[in-house]
Amino acid sequence: MAISKIGSNSVNLASGLDISDGNVTVASGHGIDFSATSDLAGKSSELLDDYEEGTYTVTLTAATSGTITMNGSYNTGTYIKIGRIVIASCDARISSTSSPQGNVNIGLPFAVASDGGSYLSSMVTHGVTIQTSQQGDFFIKGNDGQSYANVHYNTTTNLGLQAQNGGLGANDEFQFN
């Protein structure tokens, strides 16, 4: 391995770097720079500057009125954040409801990026289709800047309908990732 000094604050390591024990710590605002492999015009960054794993409390809300109380044993979601990408999953169950009305919203660990787009994820439900008569493939859609996602469903004749809270009840279950 060749080590050389570059300028007053940099070191160049030739032939790689092996660390037998410990971590590599990067100062805030810095990361791993992949610009040496610049491939596509229009890219905005080649710096991997964030990684995080954690849990968050999952919430379901009624967009218009009423409340949805989550089962405390089934309201913890997990997430992995790599750069700007967040992969979240949960197994959330309802404990009780009090006259929920309007669209179903499910809380996310981070707000959706405000970049002019929306993002989709598949969802599995249990009990929801029986009580609400909203049958079909459920999915969640997060929009610009929202800290929650809207629950939608598809039928054989309609795509992207927003799920309504009216029929939700105890033990209804939402799972996504």
What are these regions (language model features)?
Residues 37-46, 55-82, 91-114, 159-171:
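Surface-exposed ligand/attachment interfaces on beta-rich extracellular proteins
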Residues 19, 81, 142-144:
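Generic beta-strand structural signal
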Residues 71, 92-153:
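Terminal beta-strand-rich extracellular "head" domains
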